[in-house]
Design a protein with these regions (language model features):
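N-terminal secretory targeting modules
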Residues: 1-47, 51-59, 67-76, 108-109, ...
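A general marker of short, structured functional hotspots
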Residues: 19-20, 27, 61, 80, ...
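Short, mixed-charge, low-aromatic patches
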Residues: 20-30, 53-63, 92-99, 139-142, ...
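Conserved SGNH/GDSL esterase-like catalytic core that processes O-acyl groups on lipids
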Residues: 41-45, 51-135
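Alpha-helical cap/lid subdomain in secreted, periplasmic
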Residues: 98-236
């Protein structure tokens, strides 16, 4: 009996340690703490996938790019992270962002500014369709543009995908990202007359700023936030 109790205790401790490690590096994304705002703050919704959420970033709650952006902007702004791992712009893909409760929460937040970046997960072979990507992403962005708060929308071109040990992780496709998704995002921004921030160019040849070739590390998140900060401050 004592051995069983000890075994259960060991399993419990290991489980707690594993969960803590996964949480620390942003692999557990069911927890989305939202900041409360006062009426004088400018509200910013950062919408996207695991890159926005901060997956693989050490101490993700502090070092995800929306958190860093919040620190750069200061108390005049309320920045909330609406990133959700593995989500797509394409509605017929495996995990569409618009199907999630978090999407509705981002709309209900009634932001003054929306910073949105999707596309990496759309590059998967079983997901990718250029026409659907453009149509569905335009529809999603329009859902923010038509909010009563009339937010400014900044669409981010996703960063490059880098090979690790000869391949890109998470079944993402570099050729689709480089040759189809990046041009499509720029086309969407132009079509909807919204701001476009080209993170693909910002991170070109900067593989050292990525933890797994896909997700920026803490230093990469700082650069990510800095570029968004510079554009927002120049436009506000």
């Amino acid at each position: 009996m004592l051995k069983i109790i000890i075994a259960i205790a060991v399993i419990f401790i290991l489980a707690v340690i594993l969960i803590s490690v996964l949480y620390h590096f942003g692999f557990i994304d069911f927890y989305h703490p939202m900041k409360k705002t006062d009426k004088n703050q400018i509200k910013i919704a950062c919408v996207g996938d695991s890159i926005t959420f901060g997956c693989t970033v050490r101490n993700w709650r502090k070092n995800n790019y929306p958190a860093v952006l919040s620190n750069l902007l200061g108390e005049k702004y309320c920045v909330n992270n609406f990133g959700y791992t593995n989500r797509t712009a394409i509605k017929s893909a495996d995990y569409p962002y618009v199907n999630e409760k978090l999407y509705r929460q981002s709309l209900d937040f009634e932001p003054d500014i929306v910073v949105i970046m999707l596309g990496s997960n759309d590059s998967k072979e079983n997901n990718w369709n250029k026409d659907k990507f453009i149509n569905d992403y335009c529809e999603m962005i329009n859902s923010y543009l038509t909010l009563a708060s009339k937010p400014k929308v900044y669409v981010l071109v996703p960063p490059p995908l880098f090979e690790v040990r000869g391949k890109v992780m998470w079944q993402l496709r570099k050729d689709v990202m480089d040759n189809e998704i990046c041009p499509a995002v720029k086309h969407i921004a132009d079509k909807l007359s919204v701001w476009c921030i080209d993170m693909h160019s910002v991170f070109e040849n900067k593989q050292e700023l990525f933890s797994d070739g896909v997700h920026p590390n803490a230093e990469g998140s700082k650069l990510f936030a800095q570029k968004v900060y510079e554009v927002i401050k120049n436009e506000v």
